[in-house]
Each structure stands twice: as structure tokens, then as C-alpha cells.
Swiss-Prot record:
One Pfam family per UniProt: Ribosomal_L10
PANTHER family per the UniProt record, alphabetical: 39S RIBOSOMAL PROTEIN L10, MITOCHONDRIAL
Species this protein is from: Haemophilus influenzae (strain ATCC 51907 / DSM 11121 / KW20 / Rd)
Role this protein plays: Forms part of the ribosomal stalk, playing a central role in the interaction of the ribosome with GTP-bound translation factors.
Gene3D superfamilies for this protein: 3.30.70.1730, 6.10.250.2350
Protein name, as recorded: Large ribosomal subunit protein uL10
The entry's keywords: Ribonucleoprotein, Ribosomal protein, RNA-binding, rRNA-binding
Lineage of the organism: Bacteria, Pseudomonadati, Pseudomonadota, Gammaproteobacteria, Pasteurellales
Superkingdom as given in the UniProt entry: Bacteria
Amino acid sequence: MALNLQDKQAIVAEVNEAAKGALSAVIADSRGVTVEKMTELRKSAREAGVTMRVVRNTLLRRAVEGTDYECLKDTFVGPTLIAFSNEHPGARARLFKEFAKANDKFEIKGAAFEGKIQDVEFLATLPTYEEAIARLMGTMKEAAAGKLARTFAALRDKLQEAA
């Protein structure tokens, strides 16, 4: 179906707004994936706070101009599915990576975070805010317990030397 100028401008504006508010973006090619599988992906994307859209490459190039995702322009070849993550930078990378494992024809073309092209593996392994805090607290707790044990051992040794 041919798009008129107003429709094209609306698509560019919509994608541009999504890009400006997003933490990260992933580009993929979904040729050969069944409609049923794509519907499942879209549903799980919505639940994860990920905005997904299939957009013509020329419109996508215009939409990302002046955003952090301008670096992805070289990946806009063939059918392009773009996903913006609004809540966690690794959310859509994790989602796409899992989907690509189950669907051989789904190909991840690229990803961007903070204006730079990133490896999808890097983004997929980023911890969520809660996971990062839990890791930090675990490290601090472990360090404090170890330091306390060493302090008691040093105190015990000092008392034994004095006796």
C-alpha cells in the first residue's frame, strides 16, 4: 500500500519521538519468520517496555537523524525492524537474542547504546538496575564480612603475642 506524504511524515515523527526517549535500539531482519511468531515477539516486546516497528529504510534514515541512533544508518538494508528500549538498555537485546535462538531466519543486524554501535551480546548481558544493586550489595556485604573476620583474627593474634 502506498503511503501519502502525511502518513510518511507521521511515521517519521513517531519513530523520531520513540528514538529520542529510548535508552537503546536494535535493528533486525525478520524475513522468513511466520506471522504467528512475530505476533508473539510483539506481545513479549510490549510486556518488556520495548517499542517495535517495521519501517521503510528511507523513512527510518530521516527519523533517526539528530538522535543517538544515527550511527545505525549503515544497517538499514533490506526489511528493517527497529526496536527501542525505554526501561532498560538490555531489555530488547535480550528479547531479540532469545527470539533469534528459537527462529533461525530472524537476524539481528545491529544495536546502539548511548550513540555508539554496540555488540548485542554486550547489551543482552547488562544487568537490570535491581540486579546491579543486588550485586553491589553482595560485594559490599562480602567485603565487610571478610574485613571483620580479618580484624578479629589480627586482634586474636595480638592478644596471643601479648600473653
